[in-house]
Structure formats: structure tokens, C-alpha cells
């Protein structure tokens, strides 16, 4: 029998990823009583099997790459090698450290953390581990899961998802990646740097479709093609099967293009077609929430669902499957609960792909503006206009592209070149603050920094 928990909480949060733990910390700081339910490990996909572990692996690959090409900077490194099991072990160490950090922060703010699968029975009650918890406000932060489409033959072969690729301690000779989006390209970069023959099969006619500047994405693809990655674009995968050659343990991916059918054979197959919100397994159906056309949970600008006192943040809403979006949504939700005026804005959410070179964008793309018929002008500048970039990127170039509206306000910014991830926030701030080119120019940038490229472009 269920025991009624004497603990009543002002806020109950389902899911301990970036949305959930940010909300818990913010609510705790505001003096609210908070209970957070997490069935696996605090930090969610992002911290345990996404953002952080992939960046850790990519940094090892980038360091190895840098050492191999150190001669460009007049540094001689006689023999360079890497140790994959040690790279994986370091990744696990980094993750453990950060998970403990999240736990420490939550505990410090008085958050009750409950490990286990929670079920929402109604908007004021959550069951977990035979206990019932009562709450005034309910936050759903259940995240997303890897989506593997039902490709004919997929059940006959052994394939990797991003999670398997993160923990794999033996390098395959060859790797086929289905999906040339962010996850696909980051793993393509990692394995290519370590000497694996990589082929990317992408259904669209360009990699990184949806959110990234098409022209810059094409330039990144050209750079990786030079490094040996093969790209099959506008290629719809029709089936996968064990390779038919005798005594072969390889996997064959069959696809169709406008020019006819084709196939690629590789030792390993990585599925990175995308992610979808987690809607099942926690009693969502007991709440009767309004859904969007795409079937996601509908929320307003304060992250409130159609049921008063119930909020949804992060990947579950399906707006933007990014950790930093989830963090901001969580802040907005807690502000709504404590009565602080705030609203979610999606105008300036940066997107980054941590390849080498990095590519990043924020705000509008040329494609999104053209589609809506908005007048704009594009300003493009080679990254070589930044002295710091030239000093640190021998024999490499990149590009910075700014999109300005008819009144000269900054609408979008896109960068190909390191460290795009670190400088894109400058452009995000300009967009969020609705700065014009003139207004942005008045800000003094330290010299020499790569971020000055924006000022040069204006």
C-alpha cells in the first residue's frame, strides 16, 4: 500500500537534466521547498552521455591532431600516439566530477533528491518508490531520447547509438554514420581525427540542416572531405544488412539518390538521426495537457502548460533540443512560480557544432529570412581579418557572416573557425539587446581576440 508522504513541497520536478537541476537550484535559492526525481544520474543526457562527454573526447582528438601538425608552429614532436581506453577513462572522470558538482549544489540549496522512476498521478501528486509526494507546482523536465527509425534490416545488424560510441574502447577501421546533423558530425570529426575511415550518409542535400548557415556548413563539409571523410548527400537509407561478402563481419548500408541506388560498407554503424521528447513512462497521460500540432507539450512564454500549476521545460517541449535552452526555460518557469516577471525568448539561442574547426550560429539564417521574405543584407569576412586567428590557425581559414536588417539591427551571426563556440555569445547578446551595427561597434573589444572579427565585419 502507498504511504502518504508527510512532506509537502512547493515544487516537484521530474527529471534531473539541465532543465530539472537548474529549476531545482533556482527554486531552492528562492527559498521554496523542492523535491527532484531522477531515475538515472543527475545531469541528464547532457552531462552523462551528451554535451560534456563528447566535448571531452573531442578535446583529446583535437590535442592529438594538434600534436601531429605541431611542425606548422615550429614545434617538433617526434612520436605522437593516443590511448583510446585512457581517453574514455578520462571522459568518465570528468563526468563523475561534474555530476558530484551538480549534486553538491542542489544539496546546498536544500533540494530533496529522490532516485527512482516517478509517476505523476495528478497535478498535485507524484508517486515514487511506494511513496506519494504532494506538490503545489509540478515541473516536467523529462528530456529526450535517441530516435532510431525502423529501417529495414536494422534488427539484423549490431549498431551504435551515441552512447555506444562514447564508451567504445576499440577503434573500428571504418565507420558509417547515418545522419549528418550535429551529433553525426561531432562523432565523424572525432573518429576521423583518430584515423578511422568515416562515411556520412545524409538524407538532406547538406550537412547540419536546420539552424546552421548552409554556406558555412558546405565549407565545413569541404574541409572534412579534404581530410578523408566521404559524404553521401540527398541519400535516403532504404536498408541495412550484414555484408554479403564471404567471411565478412562488415555492415552494408543501402541508400537511394536521384542518380540511383548506392551502398557503403563499414565495420561499424552509428545511428545519429536525431532525438525525440520522452512522453511515456511517467504518467503524462494523467494530466490531460494540451499538445502542439507535432504532439509536443504546449507551453506559453512562461513555460506554463494548459493545466494551471504544471510547467514543462527542456526537450519535452520540442522547441529547441539544447541544454542551454533548457536552462533558460527552467529559469523562466521558476520566475513564473515566484511571481517574477519574465518570458522565454527564442530569438537568440546559439547553436554550436564542436567539430575542428567549430561552427556556430545565432539568430536568423539567410534561409529563414528568405523563407519569411524579410529584407536583409549579409556581410561576410574571412577569419584572417582577426590577427589572433591568424596567429593561432596556421594554414587554416574560416569565415564570419553577419545578417543585418533594413534598419541595420543585427538579425543573425554565423562563424566557421575556432573558437566559434566562445565568441558566438557576443553576437547573441547583440541580437537579444536589439543592437544596430552602430551600437555594437561602440563596444570595445580586447585586442587581439578572435571576437574582434564581428567588429571588423561591421
Residue ranges and their predicted role:
Residues 7-19, 171-181:
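Beta1/beta-strand and adjacent pyrophosphate-binding region of the FAD-binding site
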Residues 8-9, 25-32, 37-173, 199, ...:
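Glycine-rich flavin
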Residues 12-14, 118, 133-143, 178, ...:
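Short hydrophobic core segments
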Residues 51, 142-197, 201, 230-231, ...:
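Glycine-rich dinucleotide-binding loop and its adjacent helix/turn
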Residues 112-115, 119-127, 195-301, 371, ...:
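A Rossmann-like FAD-binding core segment of flavoenzymes
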Residues 146, 295-309, 388-401, 405:
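FAD-binding beta-loop-beta segment adjacent to the flavin cofactor pocket
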Residues 155-171, 263-338:
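FAD-site-proximal beta/loop scaffold in flavoenzymes
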Amino acid at each position: 500500500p502507498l504511504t502518504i508522504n508527510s512532506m509537502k513541497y512547493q515544487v516537484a520536478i521530474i527529471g534531473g537534466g539541465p532543465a530539472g537541476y537548474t529549476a531545482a537550484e533556482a527554486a531552492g535559492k528562492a527559498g521554496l521547498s523542492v523535491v527532484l526525481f531522477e531515475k538515472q544520474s543527475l545531469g541528464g543526457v547532457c552531462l552523462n552521455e551528451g554535451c560534456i562527454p563528447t566535448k571531452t573526447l573531442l578535446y583529446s582528438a583535437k590535442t592529438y591532431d594538434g600534436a601531429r601538425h605541431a611542425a606548422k608552429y615550429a614545434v617538433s614532436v617526434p612520436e605522437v600516439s593516443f590511448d583510446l581506453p585512457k581517453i574514455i577513462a578520462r571522459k568518465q572522470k570528468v563526468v563523475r566530477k561534474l555530476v558530484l558538482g551538480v549534486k553538491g549544489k542542489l544539496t546546498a540549496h536544500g533540494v530533496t533528491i529522490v532516485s527512482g522512476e516517478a509517476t505523476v498521478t495528478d497535478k498535485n501528486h507524484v508517486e515514487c518508490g511506494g511513496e506519494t509526494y504532494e506538490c503545489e507546482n509540478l515541473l516536467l523536465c523529462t528530456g529526450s531520447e535517441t530516435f532510431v527509425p525502423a529501417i529495414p534490416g536494422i534488427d539484423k545488424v549490431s549498431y551504435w547509438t551515441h552512447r555506444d560510441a562514447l564508451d567504445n574502447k576499440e577503434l573500428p577501421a571504418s565507420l558509417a554514420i547515418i545522419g549528418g546533423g550535429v551529433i553525426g558530425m561531432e562523432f565523424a570529426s572525432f573518429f576521423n581525427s583518430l584515423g578511422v575511415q568515416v562515411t556520412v550518409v545524409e538524407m538532406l542535400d547538406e550537412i547540419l540542416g536546420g539552424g546552421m548557415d548552409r554556406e558555412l556548413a558546405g565549407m565545413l563539409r569541404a574541409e572534412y572531405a579534404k581530410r578523408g571523410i566521404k559524404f553521401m548527400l540527398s541519400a535516403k537509407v532504404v536498408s541495412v544488412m550484414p555484408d554479403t561478402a564471404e567471411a565478412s563481419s562488415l555492415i552494408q548500408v543501402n541508400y537511394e539518390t536521384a542518380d540511383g541506388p548506392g551502398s557503403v560498407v563499414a565495420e561499424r554503424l552509428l545511428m545519429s538521426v536525431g532525438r525525440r521528447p520522452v512522453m511515456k513512462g511517467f504518467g503524462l497521460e494523467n494530466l490531460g495537457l494540451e499538445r502542439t500540432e507535432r504532439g509536443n507539450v504546449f507551453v506559453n512564454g512562461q513555460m506554463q502548460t494548459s493545466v494551471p500549476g504544471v510547467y514543462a521545460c527542456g526537450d519535452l517541449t520540442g522547441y529547441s533540443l539544447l541544454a542551454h535552452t533548457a536552462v533558460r526555460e527552467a529559469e523562466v518557469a521558476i520566475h513564473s512560480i515566484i511571481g517574477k516577471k519574465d518570458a522565454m525568448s527564442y530569438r537568440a539561442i546559439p547553436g554550436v557544432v564542436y567539430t575542428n574547426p567549430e561552427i556556430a550560429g545565432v539568430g536568423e539564417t539567410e534561409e529563414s529570412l528568405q523563407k519569411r521574405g524579410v529584407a536583409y543584407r549579409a556581410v561576410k569576412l574571412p577569419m584572417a581579418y582577426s590577427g589572433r586567428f591568424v596567429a593561432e590557425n596556421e594554414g587554416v581559414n574560416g569565415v564570419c557572416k553577419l545578417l543585418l536588417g533594413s534598419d541595420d539591427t543585427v538579425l543573425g551571426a554565423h562563424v566557421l573557425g575556432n573558437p566559434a563556440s566562445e565568441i558566438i555569445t557576443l553576437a547573441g547578446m547583440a541580437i537579444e539587446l536589439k543592437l544596430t551595427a552602430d551600437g555594437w561597434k561602440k563596444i570595445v573589444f580586447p585586442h587581439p581576440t578572435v571576437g574582434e572579427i564581428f567588429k571588423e565585419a561591421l
